[in-house]
């Protein structure tokens, strides 16, 4: 295939020299200067290189060269005659000039100052380049002064604004924002500024060829709506390629051919243009032409393989011949070999259209059939401002076109996912229309949620395209969606926030703005908070963190009421690992926003306490303890001060409430439950029973004949109350119990328990005989401790025997006593004991301190003792162990007695 560009034949050097000499003799210096300044197009591009001349001469015969020389000689003579005629018309010789012309010239010279003044008075806006820089304030003032929109000044300003906006948008385009740039570009009148658009696209592509695929996609979208703009860009591209080929400008050929290749991939240009360009480049192969052809073939080779396999086979066959026959550089030979390897791999590294740029359907695209060798008008006049007498009419026409295109684009984006169901929708609409004609009303319920999907997509695009939350809120409110979609909008804001890698304050501010604007948004976010907390286990950790931080922001700014925390109930049963993580991040974020003092004050607000009952539970000590441990573990222990006080005061409150409960309940089940609760309250101080029992036995030695049940109740009280604190209330309690015990003793003496007493005396005597061996070494210790007045544990060892005797008495009397009387006595003793348990428990801390002090004194004393003292100390340890074992046996017997009393046989 031969193009018109390749049909230019060079002439001989001798003819050139003759013509040049004759021309120089006949022409003046001014004419020669004009000829040098003339463009290559006027000279018909005769400055070919010697290598091209040799290549053209190599394949032609002598006859054909002679014919071509004669033709060139004739053409040159004709051209010289034309130039001489033009020169004679424009600049006649001085002798031929008329005197009238000289007179007119002198008069025009006199009028020059006046014309200069007129030029100086021109408006800077009307100059070709827009004039000097005008400050924005002055420019706005000048625009306000212009009232006639059809005036020249207004059209000039709108032209300059159009040029700036088109250049800015073209320079900003990339793969990610191409859809947004297209929408903004269509807002401008690109029909009026199509020359500016074409020039901007070509300049941007030549400056950055790496983004050629992006510019090609942009041109493809514009071509689908305005085919004349795509045709203009393609014409200018072809002319640029031909210009670069004639000038041997490799860089211009590379950029232009690459752009053409991508336009062919986008179906803007036909594949015939590609084959013509490749044929031209490989017809007379040089290193540069082969390199341009290979680069061009890489970009559009896969497309040519699909649409024209015979054509691409011919191109590769030509490359193979060049590789074997032509004398080209090694680098170019290697490039040809690489090209064959790329073809063998199926052009896998050079796809037709990159992902994200296939934005136009094949049916919507308009393909231009523009051959390479035709003459095209680049329409450069479109690049320059020209006044339009019908300016406002054309603007209104473009507004109508723009509205149609943008509305069509919105419907296309909404129907991308439901393209398959479009026919069904049309059938349903037809059926609905027929039924309406018959007079029947039919309601169609859409179960596919197509409208919901399109609504969510619209919101997502609005959020992602906004720079700040105020702009986003303005865009969303401008959509004017129905009130039924309010909650869906709030859900979409939360979902967008959860999808981010890290929490962005943008979403918290956006949600807060909507909550402040309308009550419905606030109620929607309240419901979403409860739903999210109930289903928080479905979220990943990253999404959970973002959701918690967003809701913390809403509560901190008081966009949401704090009553939403009512749904949070802290306990081991009602929480999961996900909900605990949510509460942890939520409160840590609140503490970071507000500070611990303000957060604590808000949680102590009396008006909000009903909503914090689940968050700070006080109904059950177990839940209270769980909440305290939870907040302490997350570093917010300062929020649990009141819970700790409540947990300390809980036993006192329970003890104060139980006597009233016992008076109201008369059933045996209520009495047994009250006794079990009192026993559970007294079980906290069982660890100190050994010390308290020894002291109680020494003080109550005169009441050794007291009944078993009364002594047991007294021992329980003394176990709780004895310590280093000798308060008056405890003394009064002991005296009252002693009097009650004596009365009970007198009653029981009437019944007579002679046998139990004799057995008790025998056992006590045996016990004393067994312990008599240790009295010799126990005396000096007691003497030493009595002199020093140190309350240590060794002072109590001498009382162990008496305590054991009394405990044996209690066990025997419990075995043979009347169970009915025992239950009555227990009720009385329990009611009295429960009144003072809250007072007696206060002394436990003091007893612990005293025991620690006594142990320290024992350690100091044991360090200074001799070997004999160490032996005695070992004996004391043995006695201590025996006392522990005896106490354990006593406790087990007591438990057995209690079980017998609670058994149904005993109650009957």
Swiss-Prot record:
Keyword GTP-binding in annotation: no
Top-level lineage group: Eukaryota
Protein name: Pre-mRNA-splicing factor CWC22 homolog
Function according to Swiss-Prot or TrEMBL: Required for pre-mRNA splicing as component of the spliceosome. As a component of the minor spliceosome, involved in the splicing of U12-type introns in pre-mRNAs. Promotes exon-junction complex (EJC) assembly. Hinders EIF4A3 from non-specifically binding RNA and escorts it to the splicing machinery to promote EJC assembly on mature mRNAs. Through its role in EJC assembly, required for nonsense-mediated mRNA decay.
Record's compositionally biased regions (Basic and acidic residues): 28-56, 66-85, 113-122, 726-770, 801-817, 826-908
Quaternary structure and partners: Component of the pre-catalytic spliceosome B and the catalytic spliceosome C complexes. Component of the minor spliceosome, which splices U12-type introns. Interacts with EIF4A3 and PRPF19 in an RNA-independent manner. Direct interaction with EIF4A3 is mediated by the MIF4G domain. Full interaction with EIF4A3 occurs only when EIF4A3 is not part of the EJC and prevents EIF4A3 binding to RNA.
Modified positions (Phosphoserine) in chain numbering: 39, 61, 107, 786, 829
